[in-house]
């Protein structure tokens, strides 16, 4: 049965609509958007292959290393709630540009010797990415409304591609140059600066300047939805989407932070372990790009999230039984499963919202609460590894999280809008 979306909410129609680019400028805008999205996982993915070296050189404990990996994810959640206020102040296009510049600065700062700079730079980068995370679905809705499915796929693809690029190159670059991890991590500020440069035409275009000067009105106004402001927080579908976002992100960031260390502990070299993390992103890129298409085409909406959970479970079981000998097989399964889950989680935010107004509200809730759940992944895995002295218990816990993720998918995949009366 095809879902008939309700008419656009009055509040949505009263929000200022940013003009969408056309022709050659539409291509330029799409490329600039994708380059910006590419940077939203680089800062996290570039750290994990050299986390052992960072831990040694900065004299961090296992808890400290886990905390360092957790800081960005905490920021993704905590500062997601700040993004709507900043958007009203600066406009979405200018705010993204500022976020990219802040991201570059944070990446450089974390490479300065000393734990304060390391954690401070990581914090700044995390705040910048948090703002970008919330802005991207909003920009898709405003600038690419006619191509939302395609741009959502490009967004998911760019996230996975950035992670693959950073995880795969950081160790070879450090080895080839002999610079060590600090200058090589600082190099990842260059893509952020390139993205900021590519985004400049979006700020300089006359229609963009006028659009960004028009600040959105407050959310609660005459004609807005009659439900109470906090009613979304009492909606089952909204919580299902939020929990699915949080639980799949927990597994993703746990693996992103600790997979190279796990494989090194089982005998892999630093370069091989970093490559395996990068390799897992390639099937993930394809799966995340296909996720919006699968959401729209498959009649049984629960099949894609179930497939994602089964693929992830295959990878986790492989890490328990033969992490090195079957590494390529397990990384393929894990990459496909996590890539599909990421694409589905982002897609649910759009699909379960009746209009742009609710998309913004659900995006803030799902990413804010979701990433606060996700921060338990890197920190929790580090603590479990320290407590147990091995990786079996942490991986078993990730399997248990998969069960909860699958349960959340039942509600998130239902063909129902948030705040629907029935």
Pin down the residues of each PLM region.
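Helix-loop-helix hairpin linking two adjacent transmembrane segments in secondary transporters
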Residues: 115, 146-147, 154-207
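Extracytoplasmic gate region of multi-pass secondary transporters
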Residues: 47-48, 236-288
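Conserved MFS/SLC helix-loop-helix module at the cytosolic interface between two early adjacent transmembrane helices
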Residues: 78-116
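Cytoplasmic helix-loop-helix junction between adjacent transmembrane helices
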Residues: 123-157
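Helix-to-loop junctions at the C-terminal end of transmembrane segments
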Residues: 79-91, 287-300
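A late C-terminal transmembrane helix in Major Facilitator Superfamily
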Residues: 356-391, 398
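C-terminal transmembrane helical hairpin of 12-TM major facilitator-type secondary transporters
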Residues: 301-345
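Residue-level signature of mid-helix packing/kink "hotspots" within the transmembrane helices
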Residues: 45, 73-81, 164, 281-289, ...
